[in-house]
Amino acid sequence: MTVLETENLTHYYENGMAGAVAAIENINVKFEKGEIVGIIGHTGSGKSTLLQHLNGLLKPDSGRVLLCGEDINKDKRTLRAARFRVGLCFQYPEYQLFEETVYKDISFGPKNMGLDSAEIDRRVRRAAEFVGLSEEHLKKSPFDLSGGEKRRAAIAGVMAMEPEVLILDEPTAGLDPRGREVILSLVRTYREQTGSTVI
C-alpha cells in the first residue's frame, strides 16, 4: 500500500542574477507502507529539498505530495496533521536540541500534538528505549551527552511522535563506524517493531 507519494513535484530556488534554478523537477516517487528506502545523489542534487517537501516544510512550486492519497498542502489542518504523521529528522539533528533535559526534548513533539501527560510519558520512554537511552540519560541536559547520544536523543524526539513515515536526512553523517552501525541498527529495529516506512 502506498503511504506517501509525489506527483510531478517541482521546486525552484532563486539564484540571484541567474534567476530561478530547479532544485527538483517533475519528481514522481511512491513509498510503500513498512519499507526502508534510501535516496542517494551528489551534494546539491536535491535530496534534502525532496525530503523537506515530504512533510510539508517546503511547498512545491508545482506538483503534489500525497499522504495516503490526500494532498498534504490542501489546507492548514491537513498540513499540520501531515507534519505529525511524517516525521523529519534533519542532518546533524543534535544541533536542534534545546531543552534543559533529554526527557523534555524528546517530549516536545508529543506535547505539540496535544497529547495528555500519560501518553507523552509513554512515548518518550518508548522512543528512548528504541535508541538506547536510559532513565539516567533522560534526566541529563542534552548538552552533557556524547555526540552519538545527542544524535540518538534527537532521533528519539521524532520517533516519539510515532509517525507513519520516518524521514532521516543523512542520519549517519559525521559519525564514526561504530556510531553509524548503532544508528542503522536502531532504524531497522524501529521499522520492524512499528511497521513504519523509513526514508
What residue ranges belong to the model's regions?
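Helix-to-loop junction immediately C-terminal to a conserved catalytic motif
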Residues: 55
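Conserved ABC ATPase signature
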Residues: 141-145, 149
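Conserved catalytic motifs of ABC-family nucleotide-binding domains
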Residues: 162
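Conserved ABC transporter NBD signature motif
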Residues: 63-74, 82
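The feature captures the beta-strand-to-loop junction immediately N-terminal to the Walker
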Residues: 40-42
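Catalytic Walker B motif of ABC-type/P-loop ATPase nucleotide-binding domains
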Residues: 166-169
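Conserved ABC ATPase "signature" region
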Residues: 118-136
